[in-house]
Amino acid sequence: MTLRNPHLGIDNDELMRRVEALINASKNRYRITVQVANRAKRRRYDDPNDVEEGWMKPIRRAIIEMSDELTEPEIIGDE
């Protein structure tokens, strides 16, 4: 049984499924790990006063965003 904290957005099981999907979709595990870390780092330093989503750690946010881009390519597609 996984306890879900309403401030985390998704539970740990869902987060792990998203991580596995990212790794499986990538040809290189190291590269996808570095990409996620770089996105989290960039997001953290781009807007350090982000109060709206300040309760979510940057690494969790980066995983969620990148997995959404993987499963829903129209998010990043050109219109």
Curated annotation (Swiss-Prot):
Signal peptide: none annotated. The keyword Transcription applies. Its EC number is 2.7.7.6. Keywords: DNA-directed RNA polymerase, Nucleotidyltransferase, Transcription, Transferase. GO terms for molecular function: DNA binding; DNA-directed RNA polymerase activity. Promotes RNA polymerase assembly. Latches the N- and C-terminal regions of the beta' subunit thereby facilitating its interaction with the beta and alpha subunits. Belongs to the RNA polymerase subunit omega family. This is DNA-directed RNA polymerase subunit omega. It comes from Synechococcus sp. (strain JA-3-3Ab) (Cyanobacteria bacterium Yellowstone A-Prime). The lineage of its organism: Bacteria, Bacillati, Cyanobacteriota, Cyanophyceae, Synechococcales. The gene is rpoZ.
